[in-house]
């Protein structure tokens, strides 16, 4: 039989089979659209917008975009009445800098930095020769600016048409004399709630809605009326405020009008963006540094901690160090937006973590403020370029006094709209289980908790133990299951643990110590080994020359000897796949949009309208 005859026979069989199915009442399948599957996925992903809101920068784009649009996360709102006092959220300045102890703390931190610089030898085996600021000061004091052009080429934002609000670059370049308040709606990774003007939750959410809507219209060219055809993937911090997340989801679905949303954590998205399955994530942002361990798409709750400093603190510290060396631009002010932009630029241009770069070096920079001449300054710098980024590892150098510097994952305060929150689960626990846990609490309370040294050993699981102790004790007290003495003992134990936690959160850890603490909170040695073998640094706060080698050296020197013997290599990754580390988390959100499993995570507008925050508990890919 020839090939043609075989083909005809097979076709005949297929047609015969179809006739039999029709006779049995089986409907013929609908002919699929002649669109390749890959193109269908492309169309679907093209209608998903990924939003990664940062303290200083908003990154937003379609899931199919190669790169997101990055805009300053700031808004300028016009005064409603004439004569209204100006209000500006600070950028580089923060609370706790002008305390009586601040300067002494800065000096002590700088001594530790200098000692660390001197103790580490250069690659040729010799020690660095320290350069005192006096050596540069005499030269810098004599320098005067050269006028490059009588017009800088930059202009203030045109406000002659009296716009109600301005967003992003336009807000940054609003003339300080214009009647506009400046608001940064996110500070240190959380909503910027404060007692000043525009500091209420409602006002902050309104600012965010305006900024995001403007970005969608201008940079993605999507009319707001068409958002009902789009879905959103929102990236949130690992240590998040449930109330704030709930309000953001409500804003996106009910006010902006997206048809659906997936909420996921920055650290997990960073693993998707980098292609790593298990890693210790170190996210050094502009205002906060968060550390946690992620394993197979799960951020381990017990390993999360957030440090209340980042790249902007390095910029401010660099300015202080340059002032000691006679910084020639003497009109520089930390309250001036243009000067803040300049200091950020100088930090990114000159700072490094390379021990081999030493001695005095000549530099120059330009100032191009709006409606001012373009000026060229020349000056000399020595160790200041290395000292400033090293302040991240010795945060006392920032001079921040009386502020909470470390945040751990705490128990949720509960939500009246969520009937199955932790409080409900506690209230419905069996009394027998509660009594058993209360007995275990009393036994563990009798053991002293060490909280000295390098945060290893017994202290490593303190946050989780406190978390469970606090939960269990609260439920037992609520039901009156303990006798008087037992209750007093447990209450004393709880208070001592709360004191230990507050002491820990008052400490300013460097990223290296935070990494060690986070990994040490992992449940098993196998997991710890995996985390030491893969440390991923994302965000823009540690983008300094030789940062990878510097962090790797510090981790190797401080990790427990037991792991040092069995781990072949501590791999610190700062540019996975040669990508910009600032975009890794956003890119991971775009990858998440294309995964098949994401179909189960979508929360739709109608569902949210009917069930509210309960949908987050049901659909979130992390433990809500």
Curated annotation (Swiss-Prot):
Residues with the N-acetylmethionine modification: 1
Pfam families: Actin (PF00022)
Example GO biological process: cell division
Phosphoserine, modified sites: 132, 412
Cited SMART domains: ACTIN
Residue intervals passing through the bilayer: none
Record's GO cellular component terms: chromosome; nucleus
Chief location bin: nucleus
Protein location: Nucleus; Chromosome
Region (Disordered) residue spans: 1-29, 430-462
Span of the signal peptide: none
UniProt feature, compositional bias: Basic and acidic residues: 1-25
Binding locations of ATP: 55-56, 283-286
Domain of life: Eukaryota
Protein task: Plays an important role in the functional organization of mitotic chromosomes. Exhibits low basal ATPase activity, and unable to polymerize.
Subunit description: Component of the chromatin remodeling INO80 complex; specifically part of a complex module associated with the DBINO domain of INO80. Exists as monomers and dimers, but the dimer is most probably the biologically relevant form required for stable interactions with histones that exploits the twofold symmetry of the nucleosome core.
Family: Belongs to the actin family. ARP8 subfamily.
Protein name: Actin-related protein 8
Protein's organism: Pongo abelii
This protein's encoding gene: ACTR8
């Amino acid at each position: 039989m020839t090939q043609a005859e075989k083909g005809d026979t097979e076709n005949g069989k297929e047609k015969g089979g179809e006739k039999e199915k029709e006779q049995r009442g089986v409907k013929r399948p609908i002919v699929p659209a002649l669109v390749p599957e890959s193109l269908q996925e492309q169309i679907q992903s093209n209608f998903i917008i990924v939003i990664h809101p940062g303290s200083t920068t908003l990154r937003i784009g379609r899931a199919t975009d190669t790169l997101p649009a990055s805009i300053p996360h700031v808004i300028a709102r016009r005064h409603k009445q004439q004569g209204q006092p100006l209000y500006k959220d600070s950028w580089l300045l923060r609370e706790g800098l002008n305390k009586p102890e601040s300067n002494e703390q800065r000096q002590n931190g700088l001594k530790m930095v200098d000692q660390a610089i001197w103790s580490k030898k250069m690659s040729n085996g010799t020690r660095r020769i320290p350069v005192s600021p006096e050596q540069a000061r005499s030269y810098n004091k004599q320098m005067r600016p050269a006028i490059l052009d009588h017009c800088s080429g930059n202009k203030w934002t045109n406000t002659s048409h009296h716009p109600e609000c301005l967003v992003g670059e336009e807000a940054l370049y609003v003339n300080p004399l214009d009647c506009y308040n400046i608001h940064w709606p996110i500070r240190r990774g959380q909503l910027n709630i404060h007692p000043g003007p525009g500091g209420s939750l409602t006002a902050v959410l309104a600012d965010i809605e305006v900024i995001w809507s403007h970005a969608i219209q201008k940079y993605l060219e999507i009319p707001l009326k068409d958002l009902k055809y789009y879905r959103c993937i929102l990236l949130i911090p690992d240590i998040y405020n449930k109330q704030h997340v709930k309000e953001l989801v409500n804003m996106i679905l009910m006010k902006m009008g997206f048809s659906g949303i997936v909420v996921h954590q920055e650290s997990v998205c960073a693993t998707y963006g980098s292609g790593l399955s298990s890693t210790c994530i170190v996210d050094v942002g502009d205002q906060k540094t968060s550390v946690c361990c992620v394993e197979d798409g799960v951020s381990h709750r017990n390993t999360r901690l957030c440090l209340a400093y980042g790249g902007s603190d390095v910029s401010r510290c660099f300015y202080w160090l340059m002032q000691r060396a006679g910084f020639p631009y003497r009109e520089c002010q930390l309250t001036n937006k243009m000067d803040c932009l300049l200091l950020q630029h100088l930090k990114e241009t000159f700072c490094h973590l390379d021990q081999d770069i030493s001695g005095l070096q000549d530099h120059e920079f330009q100032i191009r403020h709006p409606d001012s001449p373009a000026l060229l300054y020349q000056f000399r710098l020595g160790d200041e370029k290395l000292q400033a980024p090293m302040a991240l590892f010795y945060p006392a150098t920032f001079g921040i006094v009386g502020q909470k510097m470390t945040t751990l994952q705490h128990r949720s305060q509960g939500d009246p709209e969520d009937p199955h929150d932790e409080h409900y689960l506690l209230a419905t626990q069996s009394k027998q289980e509660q009594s058993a846990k209360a007995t275990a609490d009393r036994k563990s309370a009798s053991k002293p908790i060490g909280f000295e040294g390098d945060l290893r050993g017994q202290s490593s699981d303190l946050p989780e133990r406190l978390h469970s102790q606090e939960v269990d004790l609260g439920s037992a007290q609520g039901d009156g299951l303990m006798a008087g003495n037992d209750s007093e003992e447990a209450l004393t134990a709880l208070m001592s643990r709360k004191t230990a936690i507050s002491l820990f959160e008052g400490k300013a850890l460097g990223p290296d110590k935070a990494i060690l603490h986070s990994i040490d909170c992992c449940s098993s040695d196998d997991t710890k080994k995996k985390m030491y073998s893969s440390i991923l640094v994302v965000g823009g706060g540690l983008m300094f020359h030789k940062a990878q080698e510097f962090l790797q050296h510090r981790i190797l020197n401080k990790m427990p000897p037991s792991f040092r013997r069995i781990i072949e290599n501590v791999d610190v990754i700062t540019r996975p796949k040669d990508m910009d580390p600032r975009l890794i988390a956003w890119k991971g959100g775009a990858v998440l949009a294309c995964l098949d499993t994401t179909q189960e995570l979508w929360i739709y507008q109608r569902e949210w309208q009917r069930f509210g925050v309960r949908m987050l508990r049901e659909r979130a890919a992390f433990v809500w």
